[in-house]
Amino acid sequence: MWALIFSVGYIAGMDSRRGTVFTTGDGRTAIRFERLLRYPPEQVWQAITDPGRLSAWFPAVVDLDRPVGSELYFAVTAEQQRRYGMADDPDRKPNGRLLRSEPPTVLEYEWAGEILTWEISPTPAGSRLVFTNVLSDPEAARPAAAGWEAGLEVVEAQLDGAPVTWDPLARAEELAAAYE
């Protein structure tokens, strides 16, 4: 059984820094994060879709500026190749599909059997970002949750205009213990 992990909130106790790991109605394992941000949905949308920003935190190289239904190719990053010895597919066969794109409120895509959904809604103070990753492998929940939490830290720093002075992959390794 997966434990729900909560920590001190970001805005008025409503925003947990930790993701929650849960079982979906169809029995799959998923991770959910919620962030309350001081920025309008349009700025948050740019932070999760702009290739220049994605390269600082997203675990693959991908062009999301495509029509809904398009096949996507998620390439291994240079850092993953260097650090983990991961190899990119030389044939660059599609390994995903864009399922929904409704700027600036919903982005959903399939990647290697997983569904990733980004929902952005306006709030009086800015935006609520809800990210859900439905996993293909339940054993990947802990490292995936740590990785997404580290990535969201970079997104928030980018939105704040703050320099990212840490290594997101090393940060994910630090956070992994919080999901055990």
Task: List PLM regions with ranges.
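Intrinsic-disorder/low-complexity, polar/charged segments enriched in Ser/Thr/Lys/Arg/Asp/Glu/Gln
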Residues: 28-34, 71, 93, 106, ...
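A structural signal for short hydrophobic beta-strand segments in well-ordered beta-sheet cores
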Residues: 21-22, 64, 98, 118-120
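A generic structural micro-feature
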Residues: 27, 88-92, 110-112, 123
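Short beta-edge strand/loop motif at the mouth of beta-sheet-based domains
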Residues: 32, 51-91, 167-174
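Beta-strand/loop substructures that line and gate deep hydrophobic ligand-binding cavities in soluble
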Residues: 99-100, 105-157
